[in-house]
Amino acid sequence: MSDPNLNDDATEPRGLAADTADDELDIVEAADEQDEFEAAEAEAGEPAEVAALHIEDEGDHIAETDEDIEAGAVETDEDVETDTDEDVEAGTDEDVAVAEAAEEEPAAPVDSIQALREELRTLPGEWYVIHTYAGYENRVKTNLEPRAVSLNVEDYIFQAEVPQEEVVQIKNGDRKTIKQNKLPGYVLVRMDLTNESWGVVRNTPGVTGFVGNAYDPYPLTLDEIVKMLAPEAEEKAARAEGKPAPQRKVEVQVLDFEVGASVTVTDGPFATLQTINEIKSDSKKVKGLVEIFGWETPVELSFDQIQKN
């Protein structure tokens, strides 16, 4: 028969041993967990706490960087605004200076002759010279435009001009300045030469023909037409600018002839012009009657063909 006390003593060591084994197992497991944790940290490269600290530091650094960027952006905006304002002010000052300089400096004078040359170069058509009866120049010029329209050639006949010049006439002691035809008996016409336009010009009352070949006249050169129209262009430009007309040499004509006077013919077959019926100062001619074989015949003579009796 066994002793109960012995059984209890035997049981206690076994329970103690079991507890000890459990404790050792817990220690081993804890050690294993510690080893696993350390291995994980080693693999991560740094402890979790240090990583957390680094994350916080990086957050602070990012925040500081954002603040720096914002501050830099503000400074940049201020710099840009300042530079822009300075540039605008500088540009405005320069514009004002340029405007003032432009006001102070007079505009370069325009060469009226060169301007006329450029204008004539761009105009359509060419310039031709037509011959007219003496004293019919302005009448031919006035009639050409309506004739061109009525005969449907206004697209070919563009312009007619009678060049004028100033002369001084002295008659009976009186001196006066007048304008007269520079080319007595001639009219300048700008046109495209076609059979139709040629016919309209040639058959205008007062026209005797084209200068040059009757059916194929030659046009004036640019230099020739500029020379003829330059005086009027200069006067027109001077009036537009409010300036006096350019000074040029003016012809002086002394008219010693009067209507009704008797003169002697110094050139030609006529000895005496009985009576002057008309004086044409523009063409420097007179009309009168001469006796030929006992008959009075009307003639036209120039000033240099007669002298006062």
UniProtKB/Swiss-Prot annotation:
UniProt keyword Calcium present: no
Pfam families per the UniProt record, alphabetical: NusG (PF02357)
One biological process term in Gene Ontology: regulation of DNA-templated transcription elongation
Acidic residues: compositionally biased ranges: 65-91
Domain of life the protein comes from: Bacteria
Disordered as annotated region, ranges: 1-24, 58-91
Positions in coiled-coil regions: none
Any one of the GO CC terms: cytosol
Keyword tags: Transcription, Transcription antitermination, Transcription regulation, Transcription termination
Family affiliation: Belongs to the NusG family.
Function: Participates in transcription elongation, termination and antitermination.
Official protein name in the record: Transcription termination/antitermination protein NusG
Organism: Streptomyces galbus
